[in-house]
Amino acid sequence: MELIIISGRSGSGKSVALRALEDVGYYCVDNLPLPLIPELAGFLSNSGRSAVVSLDIRNIPENPESIEALLEQLSKLTIQTKIIFLDCERNTLIRRYSDTRRLHPLSNKDLSLESAIDLENTLLEPLYQQANYIIDTTNISSHELAENLRGILRGSTDKALKIVFESFGFKYGLPADADYVFDVRFLPNPHWNPELRPMTGLEQPVIDFLERQTEVHNFIYQTRNYLEMWLPMLEKNNRSYLTIAIGCTGGKHRSVFIAEQLAKYFQSRDKDVQIRHRSLEKHHKK
């Protein structure tokens, strides 16, 4: 039995997350007032049930000590508590609100949309810092968000650590869900070869180019060794996901190739591996 608290920025997908978890059998409560959460946790502890609670910014006090006191109170109960925080880039949130023409929950404070988003970010910081999992919904669909959540919940009963290798472009910003970020912008760049420029790191000519570079081989080898050294400690740390982000300038060539190579290596070592390329979709849209 466990209590899962879902919070995050307004517009980041909390309603989608709640529906997804309800679909897999969790008892879900939307916008439960903060003081009532310990009562729900006590009920769950006695009944042996699990539940999901979403926390809206309107139910979160401005005093961060209230959240810390709640978490301390929950830690004294026998039920396991996890916090999942949904994050999203500021510009994406602005676009989502513009598309739906809905009001931000803090707009009643006579704030502009941009100011409301920034204030909410400040108020949510204590929960962000306490979160067990952070999911960046900027570039993922509702289906992908639901799948990520199901993966996290499967990890609650499956002790195997899932290693996620993701490529990204620094020009689009850092992925918020990354545990480790490796910068490969110093490596030889296929972008400067006119024939390779329109291709990606998944295509054979780019693969051949990068495989000829000694620096690329050295980077992969040393990164692999670093991860292998610390994986046993991370696996003992009772975590479900380890997200390793590889970034180049545009997330199209070098980071894609290296993420693929690292993923293949750890798959060959019987690790539970997932791979995603965050920025490739942006290039396909051009």
From Swiss-Prot:
> Which UniProt keywords are given for this protein, alphabetically ordered?
ATP-binding, GTP-binding, Nucleotide-binding
Q: Which SUPFAM superfamilies match?
A: P-loop containing nucleoside triphosphate hydrolases
* Short name of any one Pfam family annotated for the protein: PapZ_C
Q: Which domain of life is it from?
A: Bacteria
This entry's Gene Ontology molecular function terms read:
ATP binding; GTP binding
Q: Which residues bind GTP?
A: D56, I57, R58, N59
Write out the residues that bind ATP.
G8, R9, S10, G11, S12, G13, K14, S15
Q: Which InterPro entries does this chain map to? A: P-loop_NTPase, RapZ-like, RapZ-like_N, RapZ_C
The record's similarity note reads: Belongs to the RapZ-like family.
Q: What is this protein called?
A: Nucleotide-binding protein APL_0334
Q: What does the record give as the organism's lineage?
A: Bacteria, Pseudomonadati, Pseudomonadota, Gammaproteobacteria, Pasteurellales
